[in-house]
Amino acid sequence: MVFAPGEKPGNEPEEVKLQNASKQIVQNAILQAVQQVSQESQRREERISDNRDHIQLGVGELTKKHEKK
């Protein structure tokens, strides 16, 4: 292997360590972002489901009022 001026053969393992650490940081950031999006999607679905339940209750009440007339 040919080294540039001022570069020492012992630097390569340190560079590999830094590259591996960088890869791990990126992987962790991606994983965290995916988990966050997943949680937000789940919360959104729960809110939509809750809203549907409220709408159905409202329709049921309207139907009962209409039947009484």
From Swiss-Prot:
Task: Please state the span of the N-terminal signal peptide per the UniProt entry.
Answer: none
The record's Gene Ontology cellular component field reads: cytosol
GO MF, any single term: protein kinase A binding
Q: In which tissues is it expressed?
A: Preferentially expressed in the neural tissues.
State any GO BP term from the record. Answer: negative regulation of protein-containing complex assembly
Which residue ranges are recorded for the region named Disordered?
A: 37-69
Question: Which residue intervals are annotated with compositional bias (Basic and acidic residues) in the record?
Answer: 41-55
Ranges where the record places region PKA-RII subunit binding domain? 17-33
Among InterPro entries, the record links this protein to:
AKAP7_RI-RII-bd_dom
Q: Which Pfam families match?
A: AKAP7_RIRII_bdg
Free-text domain note: The RII-alpha binding site, predicted to form an amphipathic helix, could participate in protein-protein interactions with a complementary surface on the R-subunit dimer.
What's the subunit arrangement here?
Answer: Binds cAMP-dependent protein kinase (PKA). Interacts specifically with RII-regulatory subunits of PKA (PRKAR2A and PRKAR2B).
Give the protein's function: Protein kinase A (PKA)-binding protein. Binds to type II regulatory subunits of protein kinase A (PKA) and may block the A-kinase anchoring protein (AKAP)-mediated subcellular localization of PKA.
| Name of the protein | A-kinase anchor protein inhibitor 1
**Provenance organism:** Homo sapiens
